[in-house]
């Protein structure tokens, strides 16, 4: 039974569409609906970060430069800046980190103001992510979309970072360092054995770490990132759409089927000692 057949069996009762792309960096991929378009939700924050790192690499910006939280960029939703006072000044790196690890929407809007929508989209084209587009800043009262991508496109930046070719080795390392601090990775980790991530009581090294970025809106629940294992690393993206339940809660069906797919792919990879 192929890995794709096993994934289809898991998703048999899923009331929606799931797109998957996984790359083991040995010429093997797992792909389903990999070129279908999906809403990005906060996954678009990964190309925004990549654009920032390109500007830093080109010395157009410095990560130590200060930015200010402006009142007109206030937006509800994820993040912590909405609980703080406008006028707060932080470094560009701090804003970028908040944008990724707690998916801060205000920090994201500040980053979009800094970089510009067009520059982010130019970066996507430069990276070969031709189906990926940032449509606008985050404003739930004005826009129903934030961005679009495909599972295969979304994997590109993770693949580049893993290989050290996201602008440079240093920029790739910084990208991974930031994404490893991610607070929200339910889709990728919910079904995995906790021991993989926390072996403090045994003295053993932790078996698994992940650098990832998720994204959720009414119409989608997405995640993607790099899995680092004792056998090496692989990239996995899981995007969903078309389900009828728009509510946000831990037992949403996307967080039932998506994590099972992630677990299956990890166990398949480990059983083949670093291959798909």
What are these regions (language model features)?
Residues 50-58, 101, 156-163, 263-270:
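Short glycine/serine- and small hydrophobic-enriched flexible loop segments
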Residues 14-17, 110-169:
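Mid-domain, small-residue-enriched loop/turn segments at the edges of structured enzyme/sensor domains
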Residues 74-109, 147:
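Conserved catalytic neighborhood of penicillin-recognizing serine enzymes
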Residues 39-67, 236:
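Active-site SXXK
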Residues 32-39, 85, 143-144, 248:
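A short glycine/serine-rich beta->alpha loop
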């Amino acid at each position: 039974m192929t890995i794709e057949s096993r994934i289809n069996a898991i998703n048999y009762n899923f009331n929606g569409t799931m797109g998957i792309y996984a790359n083991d960096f040995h010429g093997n991929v797992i792909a389903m609906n990999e070129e279908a378009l999906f809403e990005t939700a906060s996954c678009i924050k990964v190309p925004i970060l990549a654009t920032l790192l390109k500007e830093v690499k080109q010395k157009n910006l410095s990560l130590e430069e200060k930015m200010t939280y402006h009142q007109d960029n206030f937006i509800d939703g994820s993040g912590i800046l909405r609980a703080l006072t406008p006028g707060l000044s932080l470094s560009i790196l701090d804003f970028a980190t908040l944008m990724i690890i707690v998916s801060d929407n205000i920090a994201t809007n500040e980053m979009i103001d800094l970089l510009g929508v067009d520059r982010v989209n130019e970066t996507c084209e430069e990276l070969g992510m031709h189906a990926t587009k940032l449509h606008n800043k985050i404003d739930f009262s004005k826009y129903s979309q934030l961005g679009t991508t495909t599972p295969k496109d979304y994997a590109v930046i993770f693949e580049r970072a893993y290989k050290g070719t996201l602008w440079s080795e240093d920029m790739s390392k910084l990208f991974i360092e930031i994404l490893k601090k991610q607070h929200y990775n339910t889709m990728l980790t919910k079904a995995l054995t906790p021991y993989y991530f926390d072996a403090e009581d045994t003295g053993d090294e932790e078996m698994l770490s992940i650098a990832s970025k998720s994204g959720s809106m009414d119409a989608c629940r997405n995640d993607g990132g790099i899995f680092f294992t004792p056998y090496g690393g692989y990239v996995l993206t899981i995007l969903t759409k078309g389900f009828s339940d728009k509510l946000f809660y831990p037992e949403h069906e996307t967080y039932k089927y998506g994590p099972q797919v992630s677990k299956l792919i990890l166990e398949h990879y480990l059983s083949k000692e670093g291959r798909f």
